[in-house]
Amino acid sequence: MSFDVPADRRYLESHEWAQPDDDVVRVGITDFAQDELGDIVFVELPSVGDRIEHEAEFGVIESIKAVSDLYAPVSGEVVAVNDDLEDAPELVNDDPFGDGWLLEVEADGDDYESLLTADEYEAQIA
C-alpha cells in the first residue's frame, strides 16, 4: 500500500509531521498513522499558551481500535489548536495533511532540522 508523504514537511519516527511557516510550525499525524489507527473518534490536545517539548508527549488520539500518544516534533508554545477536531475528529482520517492538522507551535530552536525528511520517513514505513 502506498501512503502520501508530502516533501514540504518533516517527520518524527512516531508518525507526526511538522510543516514550518516562518516561526510557526503546523503539526499533525501522517497518512500512515491514521491508516494504522483506523477511524479516529477523539483527539486530546494541549491548550493555546501551553508549552510542548521536542519528542515529548503532548496529547492523545483515540480510534475505534487503539489509543495512541502524540509526540511533539518541535519545542515551543502552542499558538493554535484545530478546534474543528472536537466535533469532527474524522478529519484526521479524511485529510491528515490538510484539514486534519492538530496544532500550531511557535517554535524556539532548531528541532525541525533534526526531523526525518520525506524520503527518510518513506523508507521507515516501507
Curated annotation (Swiss-Prot):
Cystine bridges: none
InterPro entries in the record: 2-oxoA_DH_lipoyl-BS, Biotin_lipoyl, GCV_H, GCV_H/Fam206, GCV_H_sub, Single_hybrid_motif
UniProt keyword Metal-binding, yes or no: no
Modification N6-lipoyllysine, positions: K65
One BP term from GO: glycine decarboxylation via glycine cleavage system
Residues that span the membrane, as ranges: none
Keywords, ordered alphabetically: Lipoyl
Origin: domain of life: Archaea
One family name in Pfam for this protein: GCV_H
One Gene Ontology cellular component: glycine cleavage complex
CDD domains hit by this protein: GCS_H (cd06848)
Cofactor: (R)-lipoate
Cofactor note: Binds 1 lipoyl cofactor covalently.
Subunit structure: The glycine cleavage system is composed of four proteins: P, T, L and H.
Entry-linked HAMAP family: GcvH
NCBIfam families assigned: gcvH, PRK01202.1
Function comment: The glycine cleavage system catalyzes the degradation of glycine. The H protein shuttles the methylamine group of glycine from the P protein to the T protein.
Family in the record: Belongs to the GcvH family.
UniProt name for this protein: Probable glycine cleavage system H protein
The organism of origin for this protein: Natronomonas pharaonis (strain ATCC 35678 / DSM 2160 / CIP 103997 / JCM 8858 / NBRC 14720 / NCIMB 2260 / Gabara)
Gene (name only): gcvH
